[in-house]
Amino acid sequence: MHRVMGIETEYGISVPHQPNANAMAASSQVVNAYAPIGAPAQRQARWDFEEENPLRDARGFEVAREAADPSQLTDEDLGLANVILTNGARLYVDHAHPEYSTPEVTNPRDAVLWDKAGERIMAEAARRAADLPMGWTIQLYKNNTDNKGASYGCHENYLMNRSTPFADIVRHLIPFFVTRQVFCGAGRVGIGADGRGEGFQLSQRADFFEVEVGLETTLKRPIINTRDEPHADPEKYRRLHVIIGDANMSEIATYLKLGTTALVLAMIEDGFLSQDFSVESPVGALRAVSHDPTLRYQLRLHDGRRLTAVQLQMEYLEQARKYVEDRFGTDVDDMTRDVLDRWETTLVRLADDPMQLSRDLDWVAKLSILEGYRQRENLPWSAHKLQLVDLQYHDVRPDRGLYNRLVARGRMNLLVDEAAVRTAMHEPPNDTRAYFRGRCLAKFGAEIAAASWDSVIFDLPGRDSLQRVPTLEPLRGTRAHVGDLLDRCRSATELVAALTGGR
């Protein structure tokens, strides 16, 4: 399994005992508190917005700037806290939330690793913010809703071939996204956008989606987002921007979320999926699946069949197994085989008894905890205490978050070890352009004026103009490609000269 991918997560933020606290200011405090550790240079490189265009639509048009909602204008430098880290990630303020965007990785296990590093970075940032003079105590949550009507995102990004028809992506992904929440939902107490409805549901995001396809990410949220901003060579690539996922604490859930999606994308790119799994009323189906933790709800397909979400996922799994056998035979890599096996085992257990997966999946682990409280204290789902337990599950503090306490007690299955997570807080992946970005920031940070996913801009002594080094190929700038060069160059001037042939 080899596909460039990444995760960007907006964290929930709370300032206890400060009812008038400004979320934007608190988020900036968090980001700025971590900057001296995450980017320890004499100057802080700014984010390079030049190549960003959030209003370009994959359906072949561009939204007029004056017609766009201000929340869509993510290419404007508003002067908010924004740090590029030595691990190749971005830590910044987005929509009044601190956001961590992982560096580009090439497989779901590495996505888990650098995503988990983001949790540790956020916990450390909040701790350091509290230690500042006049600093607030700030609590961060890796969740998706405040249960007051607001939702904030955990977005996935996948590099795809530009030649893949977008209509095929829409047709095959909508049923998959409607149903994958059975294993990657984070679980939520409350029904409806404001959470006032009584009950428990699989997904934190399902109630906030309104349309099937669209450009927006905060208004009229679509199941398929059409933003066409590849952050790479636009002639060769598109970046599929997936906004429908929950923020997962579980490493297994994150791994399955990205691994299964990557397999489905491979089938779409290769034109392998001939069956049409389209469901009727996808937005309504998305919510109906989420609202039924018994997993018995049956979706109606366009071909007349009725299937549960687990059964429809089994259909995708069967196609994926056929695809892998057809394309690779016995020469399949270990991670692809592992994703397929875990996908199947998970679906079989969900069909038998979901509670068997309390060590693997967030929604099941959370439901197990909540049912314990309900039985001991005879609590209805409307009890405020249950919403507090729900929230505490996502607390990123190692000693306070319920998920982290389950891990400490050996009650959650893991994929990556803590030593690797700690390393990933500071070191970039070796096999994408994030390696070049991160190593440049670590070694030549004082001479980097700006950077982005697709460029690093140097401010060299004796040069009147800034020197832009484009990084439009996500699989160049790797350790194998530039590692020796970076080790050999003693200055940024020497590096840029080597890259440009001395121009």
Swiss-Prot record:
Resulting phenotype, residue 241 to A: Abolishes depupylation and deamidation activities
Keyword Nucleotide-binding among record annotations: yes
Details of cofactor binding: ATP is required for the deamidation and depupylation reactions but is not hydrolyzed during the reactions.
Residues at which Mg(2+) 1 binds: 8, 92, 99
Required cofactor names: ATP
Annotated signal peptide: none
Keywords, comma-separated and alphabetical: ATP-binding, Hydrolase, Magnesium, Metal-binding, Nucleotide-binding
One family name in Pfam for this protein: Pup_ligase
Phenotype for residue 205 to A: Impairs depupylation and significantly slows deamidation
EC number: 3.4.-.-
GO molecular function: ATP binding; hydrolase activity, acting on carbon-nitrogen (but not peptide) bonds, in linear amides; metal ion binding; peptidase activity
UniProt effect for mutating residue 8 to A: Abolishes depupylation and deamidation activities
Pathway given in the UniProt record: Protein degradation; proteasomal Pup-dependent pathway
Keyword Nucleotide-binding: yes
Binding site for ATP: 101-102, 157, 239
Residues reported to bind Mg(2+) 2: 8, 155, 241
One of the protein's GO biological processes: proteasomal protein catabolic process
Residue positions of the active site: 94
Subunit structure: Likely interacts with the C-terminal half of the prokaryotic ubiquitin-like protein Pup.
Similarity comment: family membership: Belongs to the Pup ligase/Pup deamidase family. Pup deamidase subfamily.
Protein name: Depupylase
Originating species: Acidothermus cellulolyticus (strain ATCC 43068 / DSM 8971 / 11B)
Gene behind this protein: dop
